[in-house]
Amino acid sequence: MSKYIVLLVVSAIALLQFSMIECNTEDLGTIKQPLRFGK
């Protein structure tokens, strides 16, 4: 069960980070460059 909880938490954080990067592309340009999965 712990593995599923960790996966859910990681996926939720990833979705939040993705939405934040998409909404604030200009402000988080430095974060979007190293990640490189925005587009």
UniProtKB/Swiss-Prot annotation:
Family statement drawn from the similarity comment of this UniProt entry? Belongs to the FARP (FMRFamide related peptide) family.
Major location (coarse)? secreted
Modification sites for Phenylalanine amide: F37
Tissue specificity here reads: Expressed by the venom secretory cell of the spine. The spine is a cuticular structure containing a single large nucleated venom-secreting cell at its base. It is an independent unit capable of producing, storing and injecting venom. On the back of A.stimulea caterpillars, spines are grouped together by 50 to 100 to form scoli, of which there are eight.
Q: Tell me what else is known.
A: Negative results: has no effect on human neuropeptide FF receptor 2 (NPFFR2) and kisspeptin receptor 1 (KISS1R). Has mild effect on ASIC1a channels (31% inhibition at 10 uM) and no effect on ASIC1b channels.
Please explain the role this protein plays, according to its UniProt record. Strongly activates (at 30 uM) the human neuropeptide FF receptor 1 (NPFF1R), a G-protein coupled receptor, with an effect that is equipotent to the endogenous RFRP-1 ligand in activating NPFFR1. Is toxic when injected into Drosophila melanogaster. Also shows a moderate anthelmintic activity against the parasitic nematode H.contortus (drug susceptible Kirby isolate) (IC(50)=20.1 uM).
**Is Secreted set as a keyword in this record?**
yes
**GO MF:** toxin activity
Tell me yes or no: is Kinase among this UniProt entry's keywords.
no
Superkingdom of the source species: Eukaryota
Q: Which UniProt keywords apply?
A: Amidation, G-protein coupled receptor impairing toxin, Secreted, Signal, Toxin
- Choose one Gene Ontology CC annotation of this protein and give it: extracellular region
As given in the record, the signal peptide range reads 1-23
Protein name, per record = U-limacoditoxin(13)-As54
The entry's localization annotation reads: Secreted
